Swiss-Prot record:
This is Zinc metalloproteinase nas-29. Glycans are attached at N5, N27, N70, N106, N503. It holds the Pfam family CUB. It comes from Caenorhabditis elegans. It is found in: Secreted. Metalloprotease.
Amino acid sequence: MISKNTSFCGFLILVLATCMSAQFVSNESIKLHDILKPSATHRLFDTLQYSVEEQYSDSHLSFDVSTIYNYSEKPISIGKLNKKYRDILFEGDMAISYKQLSMIVNGSTEYRKAIKSRRRGNKINGESTDRTKRQAYLDNNYPATIWKNGVAFMFHESLTPIAKTAILKAVHFWYRETCIEFHPRTFQKEYLLFIGNDDGCWSTVGRDASQGKQVVSIGNGCEHFGVTSHELAHALGIFHEQSRFDRDESVVFNPRVVERDLLFNFAKISPRQMSTYGLPYDIGSVMHYTPTEFSNIPSIPTLAAIDTNLQQTMGQLEGPSFVDVHIMNQHYQCQEKCPTQAPCQNGGFTNSRNCKVCKCPTGFGGAYCQLIASSFSPFCGGYLNAEETTRRFDITIRQSTTTRSKTCVYHIKAPEGKRIIIDILKIDSKCIEGCWQDGLELKMKKDFRPVGYRFCCPESSRRKVISEGNMVPFMVFSKEHDFSVSFEYSFVSTSAGFDDEKNDSDVIVDNLDGVFVSDTSLLQRIGFRRQL
């Protein structure tokens, strides 16, 4: 068992030492076709295909042309890495057992009928189906499908050192962010076996005592924390975000750009197998499809965000979001380990490994999420006050020959009863799906828990967004490349629309720690003032 104070380096040393024991390394040859038989699953996939066709039979191709981006590199995704196994994997990367898939198919069919009944004003089991929105990520066998006694795991000898490190980072992340215990396998009959001898990145979903050994594949191209944390989340019991039964409230599905025999991958999971714990749909979840997943026209998305400002947020491979972490904590009943709950603010929740403090949404810090999160440098980040007159903000984060993650966190505040308008003037960055390497994230909603509007593509220039409330946390981040953004901001009354008036403030520059910031009030606050 891992000490709660164990750092990743200490954890790595502990596991590597355990790896020297023979029982921790497997040389058994295992491939996906040894686990699943296409002949058994194809009939069920066909049923789901018909279900999707029926549900979206009247749909028209729907997407905003402004969401077609000129990506700097060919988009990658777990689904694309698993193209070889499209005929056997569910939703691109889940090795679902016949029994589990049968339950999903039956639940999906019954739920579709229930929705039709609801439209006629009927009730389901004596209750309105509207209640399903308040349910959680679990199936009929819960809690038998979670690893209540901890997760034993072992490596296959085929795993590369890079793959092992990426897996251990994911294990350590889910240990640190939840109450789940992990330990290298000794003689446990139920355990996770990570393999690297097969193609692709795929996993089973949840604990299945009937399988005993459950396989997680981290093949060539999958050796990235965003991928390993995603696959391990499946093994711990989490489905894809876009499988939620309430997804149509957040994204539009375009079936006309998906090959007919792949439509089953867009079936929604019913409340019998999936629950949401009342948490919001998170387009920025690491468990969400990329916009163009399974599209036969690469430039046209299969999934389009209803709020088009969230389109670039979809498909990130950075790692689990705050909502992903919150769902996992709820799924494993972690907060029950604390006799009292911490007074968390801004959407935070009690940290089960230290019940006196909170886990905080991105952009917030402090014991109770009452403060702004810290930035990578003392020369960036802080509070900005919005005024009726327009102010301008410019920032450039540069990477040296040795790249490292750099994030500057700001909160824009306006008086009570006002809203904040941000006019993005220019973005200079590498444009990729999900904007997870370098970009700007604006949290314009009152609910700070989901990932906000992310922008990293030059096409986002001249875009205006308006907040729901009087505070906007925003993050400017660079992980691999230089990033630069310029925008103007001001406040308006809650009933006002966009205002195009411009009134530039003095331009000030701070070039310490590779950060260049322009904002009069900010630089006066940190006591660094130099006329450009």
